[in-house]
Curated annotation (Swiss-Prot):
HAMAP family: SlyX (MF_00715)
NCBIfam families the record matches: PRK00295.1
Name used for this protein in its record: Protein SlyX homolog
Family: Belongs to the SlyX family.
Organism of provenance: Pseudomonas putida (strain ATCC 47054 / DSM 6125 / CFBP 8728 / NCIMB 11950 / KT2440)
Tree of life domain: Bacteria
InterPro entries according to UniProt: SlyX
Pfam families tied to this protein: SlyX
């Protein structure tokens, strides 16, 4: 294998690796966006849950059923 052929092979591999790295980076960026949205949704759900518990009292504060 000549030096020129080796250079072409290495440049070709690098081009494919660059494409793969970019594709993986795109996936990571999208996953980060999804995680951020999920964190915001989770925070909103926690806030709603705390508001509901505040309105209706916690489960530990319930009076025992009438048959006790």
């Amino acid at each position: 294998m000549t030096l020129e052929m080796r250079m072409v092979e290495l440049e070709t591999r690098q081009a494919f690796q660059d494409d793969t790295i970019q594709a993986l980076n795109d996936v990571v960026v999208e996953q980060a966006r999804v995680i951020e949205r999920l964190q915001l949704q989770m925070a909103e759900l926690i806030k709603r849950h705390e508001e509901m518990v505040g309105q209706y009292g916690s489960e530990g504060e319930e009076a025992p059923p009438p048959h006790y």
